């Protein structure tokens, strides 16, 4: 999608309140990707993305900005937590697994696009597979009359299948099953091994299963995709997308910074993780199930609150790989009020739509919304600042009884006013000990 930086920021304004600096920097970074692709191949290789370090408390919009953009522009995107990785030689996930995760995200993205483009062919394949089970093909040498009868029966069955009349009927189908897909107890560090065995086909077997036709339609989608779609071209396109459009969002990077005030260096593996991360961010080759993925042009966005450490506590080499830094603003009551009212799918709209399913019309008057924002802001000031996430807790507590008794208000309109907000939340916010547990 070819959008100018101004258009990108305008799009983000519908979902993320404030944070103009962060939006601007990311918009420029994404536009530079488009600009790079217009250049000669030789020059493209020399232009590397300027990675971004976002500094700000939880809940201020760091992840949301990156996630929304990646989804809107159709870029492969993954969010990982730096604190979940371990240094090479320690038990746990190695940093290369984030690149394999990005490869999987790119592969799924391209597969879904191709399935959508070839939807009619895939639906026809699934339809024919199910019809073969419902009405097995006639043997050779059957009379023309019998063949005509069979053809008519097949078309009647096809019509019923398309109309959903047979959805509850049960059939036995044969589907591929991989032992790694069905074993949830495998450790995360087995990710590379899983990719390898899937590529060479080891551990995969055909199993027969009885299921309803509506479930069989979904179960056969993968097989249909494997048969109809060009798997090699899908992998090739996924590799290209991951390398040139991939975004890896590294959250909690402050958790692997070794604080200068910590003379004991309680966790020596933190620096080890940083050093393992360095070649990935600088540019290296990682083996994935879609091929050797070069990380040179992946955009890395790191984020952290940096309450107990500073960006300068990261090793100098890693600091240098994140040249663009932006500090996100904390959210005051005015920003929280806007978060409740401005976004397309604001929190209040979500709750209203949920209760609408119970035939209950829910409204919030303006004074009530302002009071909710004030209470959330005060809770953030007096306790840990969790940004906009505090609104979820506050509104859940406010609407707890109404959600429980929603059926009693069916067919009615319920207006949340300032008085109700004060009655439900006033005593809690005044009692700091109680507020710590509830809000």
From Swiss-Prot:
Its main location: cytoplasm. One of its GO terms (cellular component) is HslUV protease complex. One of its GO terms (molecular function) is proteasome-activating activity. GO terms for biological process: protein unfolding; proteolysis involved in protein catabolic process. ATPase subunit of a proteasome-like degradation complex; this subunit has chaperone activity. The binding of ATP and its subsequent hydrolysis by HslU are essential for unfolding of protein substrates subsequently hydrolyzed by HslV. HslU recognizes the N-terminal part of its protein substrates and unfolds these before they are guided to HslV for hydrolysis. SUPFAM superfamilies: P-loop containing nucleoside triphosphate hydrolases. It is found in: Cytoplasm. Keywords: ATP-binding, Chaperone, Cytoplasm, Nucleotide-binding. A double ring-shaped homohexamer of HslV is capped on each side by a ring-shaped HslU homohexamer. The assembly of the HslU/HslV complex is dependent on binding of ATP. Pfam families: AAA, AAA_2, ClpB_D2-small. The keyword ATP-binding applies. It comes from Campylobacter jejuni subsp. jejuni serotype O:2 (strain ATCC 700819 / NCTC 11168). Belongs to the ClpX chaperone family. HslU subfamily. ATP binds at residues 17, 59-64, 251, 317, 389. This is ATP-dependent protease ATPase subunit HslU.
């Amino acid at each position: 999608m070819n959008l100018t930086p101004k258009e990108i920021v305008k799009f983000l304004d519908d979902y993320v309140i404030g944070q103009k600096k962060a939006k601007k920097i990311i918009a420029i970074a994404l536009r530079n990707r488009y600009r790079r692709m217009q250049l000669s191949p030789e020059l493209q290789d020399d232009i590397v993305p300027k990675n971004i370090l976002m500094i700000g408390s939880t809940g201020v919009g760091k992840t949301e900005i990156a996630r929304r953009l990646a989804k809107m522009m159709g870029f492969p995107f993954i969010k990982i937590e730096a604190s979940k990785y371990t240094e090479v030689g320690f038990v746990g996930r190695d940093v290369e697994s984030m690149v394999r995760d990005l490869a999987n995200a790119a592969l799924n993205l391209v597969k879904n696009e191709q399935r959508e483009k070839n939807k009619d062919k895939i639906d026809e394949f699934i339809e024919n597979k199910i019809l073969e089970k419902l009405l097995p093909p006639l043997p050779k040498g059957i009379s023309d009359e019998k063949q005509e009868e069979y053809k008519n029966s097949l078309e009647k069955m096809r019509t019923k299948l398309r109309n959903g009349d047979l959805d509850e009927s049960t059939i036995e189908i044969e589907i591929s099953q991989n032992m790694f897909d069905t074993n949830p107890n495998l450790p995360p560090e087995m990710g590379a091994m899983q990719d390898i065995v899937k590529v060479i086909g080891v551990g995969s077997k055909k199993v027969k299963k009885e299921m309803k036709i509506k479930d069989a339609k979904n179960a056969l989608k993968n097989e249909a995709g494997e048969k109809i779609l060009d798997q090699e071209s899908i992998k090739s396109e996924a590799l290209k997308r991951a390398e040139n459009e991939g975004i890896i969002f590294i959250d909690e990077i402050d958790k692997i910074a070794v604080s200068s005030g910590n003379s004991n260096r309680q966790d020596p593996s933190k620096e080890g993780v940083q050093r393992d991360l360095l070649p990935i961010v600088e540019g290296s080759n990682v083996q994935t199930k879609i091929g050797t993925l070069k990380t040179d042009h992946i955009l890395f966005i790191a984020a952290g609150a940096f309450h107990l450490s500073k960006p300068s506590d990261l090793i100098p080499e890693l600091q240098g790989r994140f040249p663009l830094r932006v500090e996100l603003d904390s959210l005051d009551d005015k920003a929280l009020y806007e978060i409740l009212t401005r976004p397309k799918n604001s929190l209040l709209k979500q709750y209203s739509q949920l209760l609408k399913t119970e035939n209950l019309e829910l409204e919030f008057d303006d004074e009530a919304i302002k009071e909710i924002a004030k209470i959330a802001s005060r809770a953030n000031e007096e306790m840990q600042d969790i940004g906009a996430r505090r609104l979820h807790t506050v509104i859940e507590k406010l609407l707890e009884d109404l959600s429980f008794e929603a059926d009693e208000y069916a067919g009615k309109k319920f207006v949340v006013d300032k008085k109700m907000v004060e009655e439900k939340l006033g005593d809690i916010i005044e009692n700091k000990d109680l507020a710590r547990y509830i809000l």
